[in-house]
Amino acid sequence: MAESSSPLPPLCERISHKSYFLRAVDLTILGLLLSLLLYRILHVNQKDTVWIVAFLCETCFTFVWLLITNIKWSPADYKTYPERLDERVHELPPVDMFVTTADPVREPPLIVVNTVLSLLAVNYPANKLACYVSDDGCSPLTYFSLKEASKFAKIWVPFCKKYNVRVRAPFMYFRNSPEAAEGSEFSKDWEMTKREYEKLSQKVEDATGSSHWLDAEDDFEAFLNTKSNDHSTIVKVVWENKGGVGDEKEVPHVVYISREKRPNHFHHYKAGAMNFLVRVSGLMTNAPYMLNVDCDMYVNEADVVRQAMCIFLQKSMDSNHCAFVQYPQDFYDSNVGELTVLQLYLGRGIAGIQGPQYAGSGCFHTRRVMYGLSLDDLGDDGSLSSIATRKYLAEESLTREFGNSKEMVKSVVDALQRKPFPQKNLKDSLETAQEMGHCHYEYQTSWGKNIGWLYDSTTEDVNTSIGIHSRGWTSSYIFPDPPAFLGCMPQGGPEVMVQQRRWATGLLEILFNKQSPLIGMFCRKIRFRQSLAYLYVFSWGLRSIPELFYCLLPAYCLLHNSALFPKGVYLGIIITLVGIHCLYTLWEFMNLGFSIQSWYVTQSFGRIKTTCSWLFSVLDVILKLLGISKTVFIVTKKTMPETKSGSGSKKSQREVDCPNQDSGKFEFDGSLYFLPGTFIVLVNLAALAGCLVGLQSRGGGGSGLAEACGCILVVILFLPFLKGMFEKGKYGIPFSTLSKAAFLAALFVVLSVGN
């Protein structure tokens, strides 16, 4: 007999974005690439090295496109209904929020403060939230800023919830004046809150330039005589919410932590900091879910926690199998759509397989999954199976895995069994928390190996992600509008190059460690297509080699007077391939509202970062594998725009927020990152000039218009370097780089013509 009542509406829905037309385009491009390879094979000449090199490069490009096609085949994401949450869930689960910072100079405390304030003010019961700030720089300035911010939070949080403010980072919210009647209650509250924020900002700025406050309070005694790489563990409760009823005026817990560091002890960078956050939060609040954000990624959507809970609390098999919920990363100071396009098309594509990769920020994790639980360890109702209970809950096993802290072991048992954690005084856990921050606490445990954030890579996020997927778990992707989190991009070419090198190096490290998808696709529970998706990401660095060669081949052939591309009717393969690919990628950008210029900048920077920054990642990994050197984690510099009231003019948020409208100019410095790009431009210019003056060698296979067009296309893609040769200051290429590149280019021309 059917029930009379209709089923309850879902908290979330999985949305498929399949497009048979886009699949056809992907397959067409793949077919053209295979046709080009077939032509190379049928017309190969053993004496023609260029032909063989071109074939090898194009084989790499074909394999990369095959991986892209696999990713984009079945895109999906989730639509959530947070307004249904209160009707469906009697009591919302607690959430621990983690913020990580490492350098008060490159990551100014005011940026950290704004991120923390935005987290404290989210639309979620304050008694269910706790914010933990990890300071790997052990900076008293960061701690001072947090103390002052916790005072301002008592004004900011009630203001946001009273008026349902969407953007809850003060520095961004106060950039525009409100449209409200003068003298109204809102207007008065707005003015008062803005004044208090300006006082907070001034205090932080004054403290940055002076240290008199350091000796004025006993609370800073722990920071005396400390260095960023040599100090004891510091754990301090900045603010404790003792109300515990979820009132709108309450402010969630705020805890400052800085783990012990010693010069002769490797600290595993951000992964080590995250694992200490997990342990301390497990002692104090032990929430079943954890959000982690970088210090510059503020909350841009107040319902962000509720949206994630819609995924976790949905009563379905998919939700029981979901290990983490990832939000896309977006930036308030960038008008270039590369990351947006990448996340929308490739991010959704991976989400349609086994789930998105963990991106290092803007991600909600399940605590017991981070404690090493596998999907096979769960019963149908999501609880531990009898075998898993014996495996995980034996005290001896837990001590060996998690360390010798009894309090930590007890919190792990509670988390694995999903027991509610009783409220307690946070300061009662301070002594144990400090012990767990010692350098030797993780020695002979599973932290960083099977538990928590995984080590052995500077990209701890993706390394941890593939470890989770290899245990059978899935993940979910939410693509909200407006973006859930916004951060700041590294400003200038050198900073971007450093970041790209770090990413590519870390990803390539994983390709050669035990988490490699080449191993996982055969002997772990990660799906085959998901392994291929990871392989696409991990091979970023390796792509630099064929791309570098392919940027030089047209110039070599023009100088050597040999053919690179097919002739006659077969040239149509190349023309059609390039034309379809350009139109396809241009459509992807314009479909999302980006301009043709944004598309060009992305295509240009794609070649620049691959041949310049990613190239050094290959060298880094080779030296590491040979034991000659170790990879180093370099913190990228964060900046924030000044807080100024707007004039009321109607501008988009990106236009208002972007602090550097001198964009479009590429910045250079004297580092080696810019040597390959300068060399490529000089070589292709020399080849074009040599063709015009008849410098080509005699008796070659005959280069032609196609090779000349190839050189022109390379110069267009590396146009920032061409402009940099005529600019001065930070926008100009240093003479030392130009002279080195010119010498290499001259050598290349001589060898090409001579051969």
Swiss-Prot record:
It comes from the Eukaryota. GO terms for biological process: cell wall organization; cellulose biosynthetic process. SUPFAM superfamilies: Nucleotide-diphospho-sugar transferases. The active site is at D136, D461. It holds the Pfam family Cellulose_synt. It is a multi-pass membrane protein. It is found in: Golgi apparatus membrane. One of its GO terms (cellular component) is Golgi membrane. The chain crosses the membrane at residues 24-44, 49-69, 533-556, 569-589, 615-635, 674-694, 702-722, 733-753. One of its GO terms (molecular function) is cellulose synthase (UDP-forming) activity. Keywords: Cell wall biogenesis/degradation, Glycosyltransferase, Golgi apparatus, Membrane, Transferase, Transmembrane, Transmembrane helix. Its EC number is 2.4.1.-. Thought to be a Golgi-localized beta-glycan synthase that polymerize the backbones of noncellulosic polysaccharides (hemicelluloses) of plant cell wall. Belongs to the glycosyltransferase 2 family. Plant cellulose synthase-like B subfamily. PANTHER family: X-BOX TRANSCRIPTION FACTOR-RELATED. This is Cellulose synthase-like protein B4. The gene is CSLB4.
